[in-house]
C-alpha cells in the first residue's frame, strides 16, 4: 500500500512539473536574442498585439484637404515626455514630442525648439531632427521628434518636463510609406527594453526611417524611439527587426505602454 501511495505522489509531481513548463512559453513573435529567429507563435497573446500593446497607425492622412487651396503648412504638438537618464556615457537629458500635421499640404520639420524644466532649472535647446528632409508628414498624420543631450551636471532620475515649438515647411509628397506591426516589448535587466517587430512598405526603397511613440493607458506619450533598418524593401516582402533600446532606459516601459503609434518613411 505504501509503494502504491508513493507511486501516485510521483505521478502527481510529474504532472505538476509539466504544467509549470507550459506556462513559460515565449511571448515573442520574433526572438530578439536569436537573430530574429521565429519562436512558437501559438503562445502569443490575442489580437491586441505585443504584451497587450495595441498598434495604432500614426499615418491617418486627412481626405478633406482641398487640392486647389493655397499650401498652408502647419503642425500642432499633441504630447511631450522628458527624462534625465543614466546613459552609457553619463547623465543624459531626453525629450520627445508628438505632433500632427494640421495644415493642408505635406510638411517637414525644419527646427525643433525644446524648453525643459529639470528640478526647477530651465534648459533650452534647438535642433534639426534627423533626416528631416526625408521625413515627409501628410495632412492629418502624426509623427514624432526625439532628442538626447549628454550633460554631466544633471542627476539621473531628477523630475523633468518639456514643451516643444516646431517649425515646418511645405514638402513634396512622400514616395514610400513604411509600416511596422507585430511590435513586442520586453523589459530587460539592467534597465533597458527590447523591441521586436516586422517592417513592410508600399513600394521600393533602399533606406528607411521609422518613428515609434509609446503611450500609456490614458493615451499620454511615454517616449519615442526612432531607427533605420538596413534592408532594401520592394513592397512585397517584410523584414523583422530587433532592437535593444539601451538609450531609452524608461523603467518598466513594456509594463507602462498600452499602445504604440508608428510612422515610417522609405526613400
Residue ranges and their predicted role:
Residues 17-209, 215-267:
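Membrane engagement elements in two modes
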Residues 2-22:
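Sec-dependent N-terminal signal peptides of Gram-positive bacterial secreted proteins and lipoproteins
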Amino acid at each position: 500500500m505504501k509503494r502504491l501511495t508513493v507511486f501516485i505522489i510521483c505521478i502527481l509531481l510529474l504532472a505538476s512539473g509539466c504544467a509549470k513548463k507550459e506556462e513559460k512559453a515565449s511571448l515573442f513573435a520574433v526572438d530578439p536574442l536569436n537573430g530574429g529567429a521565429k519562436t512558437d507563435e501559438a503562445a502569443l497573446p490575442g489580437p491586441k498585439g505585443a504584451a497587450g500593446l495595441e498598434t495604432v497607425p500614426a499615418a491617418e492622412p486627412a481626405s478633406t484637404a482641398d487640392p486647389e487651396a493655397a499650401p498652408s503648412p502647419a503642425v500642432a504638438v499633441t504630447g511631450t515626455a522628458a527624462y534625465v537618464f543614466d546613459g552609457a556615457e553619463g547623465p543624459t537629458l531626453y525629450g520627445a514630442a508628438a505632433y500632427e500635421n494640421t495644415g493642408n499640404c505635406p510638411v517637414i520639420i525644419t527646427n525643433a525648439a525644446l524648453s525643459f524644466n529639470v528640478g526647477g532649472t530651465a534648459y533650452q535647446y534647438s535642433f534639426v531632427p534627423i533626416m528631416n528632409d526625408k521625413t515627409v508628414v501628410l495632412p492629418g498624420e502624426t509623427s514624432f521628434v526625439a532628442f538626447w543631450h549628454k550633460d554631466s551636471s544633471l542627476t539621473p532620475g531628477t523630475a523633468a518636463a518639456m514643451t516643444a515649438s516646431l517649425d515646418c515647411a511645405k514638402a513634396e509628397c512622400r514616395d514610400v510609406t513604411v509600416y511596422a506591426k507585430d511590435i513586442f516589448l520586453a523589459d530587460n535587466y539592467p534597465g533597458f527594453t527590447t523591441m521586436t517587430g516586422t517592417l513592410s512598405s508600399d513600394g521600393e526603397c533602399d533606406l528607411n526611417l521609422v518613428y515609434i511613440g509609446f503611450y500609456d493607458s490614458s493615451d499620454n506619450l511615454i517616449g519615442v524611439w526612432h531607427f533605420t533598418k538596413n534592408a532594401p524593401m520592394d513592397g512585397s516582402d517584410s523584414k523583422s527587426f530587433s532592437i535593444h533600446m539601451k538609450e531609452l532606459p524608461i523603467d518598466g516601459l513594456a509594463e507602462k505602454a498600452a499602445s504604440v503609434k508608428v510612422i515610417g518613411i522609405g526613400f
